[in-house]
Amino acid sequence: MKNAFKDALKVGRPQIGLWLGLANSYSAELLAGSGFDWLLIDGEHAPNNVQTVLTQLQAIAPYPSQPVVRPSWNDPVQIKQLLDVGAQTLLIPMVQNADEARNAVAATRYPPAGIRGVGSALARASRWNRIPDYLHQANDAMCVLVQIETREAMSNLASILDVDGIDGVFIGPADLSADMGFAGNPQHPEVQAAIENAIVQIRAAGKAPGILMANEALAKRYLELGALFVAVGVDTTLLARGAEALAARFGAEKKLSGASGVY
């Protein structure tokens, strides 16, 4: 078993991604052929469930783009279901401390290394037990990325980085800026300083730093600092802004959005 996304992070090869919020396998397949290294299937803020995640994983599978799945919470039951339908790389939201990071890792591992329930005969991940020795290979193929999105999580970053099995740490600029008192303004100098310091700290610890930033200049800045998995756009935003711009060129009166947040 292989995990190409995890392998790329291990060797320090930057991965450029796109956020998927349309919760649709047709658009997921379209975007899988667009040249991004990874695609984030969002179960936290987009209207996804296990079934819609499954169909998007199936749609992306023939393409080089690697899927990353974000569950709605650090919940071992939900994580188990997502792994069984074929997710190998998970982005766990709102991890505040080392204990929560350890819980996330444990949920992705079969015993005795963790608490993942065994149901491989029913699982797409094992190709319904057609992958030889799946139960003994699966743990090593898992890639666990945890999100730090608050001042509390930032203060606990060093201990989170010490947790075995954490492959990367993703900085959530939208929630972090809100928690710092600058909601909707992730480009505030204090927020930017916190993000940049975290990227350097994560990389120095031998883990992969990640972030979502649609501002091209900032995304490139984070890559220069050592970020290894950077999402540079969101499908919903690309569709909305592209449609608005096209309509405007033909005289439509709708005012184009001036939003300047992360997305």
Swiss-Prot record:
<keyword id="KW-0058">Aromatic hydrocarbons catabolism</keyword>
<dbReference type="InterPro" id="IPR005000">
    <property type="entry name" value="Aldolase/citrate-lyase_domain"/>
</dbReference>
<feature type="site" description="Increases basicity of active site His">
    <location>
        <position position="84"/>
    </location>
</feature>
<dbReference type="InterPro" id="IPR015813">
    <property type="entry name" value="Pyrv/PenolPyrv_kinase-like_dom"/>
</dbReference>
<dbReference type="InterPro" id="IPR023701">
    <property type="entry name" value="HKHD_aldolase_ent"/>
</dbReference>
<feature type="site" description="Transition state stabilizer">
    <location>
        <position position="70"/>
    </location>
</feature>
<comment type="similarity">
    <text>Belongs to the HpcH/HpaI aldolase family.</text>
</comment>
<comment type="function">
    <text>Catalyzes the reversible retro-aldol cleavage of 4-hydroxy-2-ketoheptane-1,7-dioate (HKHD) to pyruvate and succinic semialdehyde.</text>
</comment>
<keyword id="KW-0479">Metal-binding</keyword>
<dbReference type="InterPro" id="IPR040442">
    <property type="entry name" value="Pyrv_kinase-like_dom_sf"/>
</dbReference>
<dbReference type="GO" id="GO:0046872">
    <property type="term" value="F:metal ion binding"/>
</dbReference>
<feature type="binding site">
    <location>
        <position position="147"/>
    </location>
    <ligand>
        <name>substrate</name>
    </ligand>
</feature>
<comment type="pathway">
    <text>Aromatic compound metabolism; 4-hydroxyphenylacetate degradation; pyruvate and succinate semialdehyde from 4-hydroxyphenylacetate: step 7/7.</text>
</comment>
<feature type="binding site">
    <location>
        <position position="175"/>
    </location>
    <ligand>
        <name>substrate</name>
    </ligand>
</feature>
<dbReference type="InterPro" id="IPR050251">
    <property type="entry name" value="HpcH-HpaI_aldolase"/>
</dbReference>
<feature type="binding site">
    <location>
        <position position="174"/>
    </location>
    <ligand>
        <name>substrate</name>
    </ligand>
</feature>
<dbReference type="GO" id="GO:0005737">
    <property type="term" value="C:cytoplasm"/>
</dbReference>
<feature type="binding site">
    <location>
        <position position="149"/>
    </location>
    <ligand>
        <name>a divalent metal cation</name>
    </ligand>
</feature>
<dbReference type="Pfam" id="PF03328">
    <property type="entry name" value="HpcH_HpaI"/>
</dbReference>
<dbReference type="GO" id="GO:0010124">
    <property type="term" value="P:phenylacetate catabolic process"/>
</dbReference>
<dbReference type="GO" id="GO:1901023">
    <property type="term" value="P:4-hydroxyphenylacetate catabolic process"/>
</dbReference>
<feature type="binding site">
    <location>
        <position position="175"/>
    </location>
    <ligand>
        <name>a divalent metal cation</name>
    </ligand>
</feature>
<dbReference type="GO" id="GO:0043863">
    <property type="term" value="F:4-hydroxy-2-ketopimelate aldolase activity"/>
</dbReference>
<feature type="active site" description="Proton acceptor">
    <location>
        <position position="45"/>
    </location>
</feature>
<keyword id="KW-0456">Lyase</keyword>
<comment type="subunit">
    <text>Homohexamer; trimer of dimers.</text>
</comment>
<dbReference type="InterPro" id="IPR012689">
    <property type="entry name" value="HpaI"/>
</dbReference>
<protein>
    <recommendedName>
        <fullName>4-hydroxy-2-oxo-heptane-1,7-dioate aldolase</fullName>
        <ecNumber>4.1.2.52</ecNumber>
    </recommendedName>
</protein>
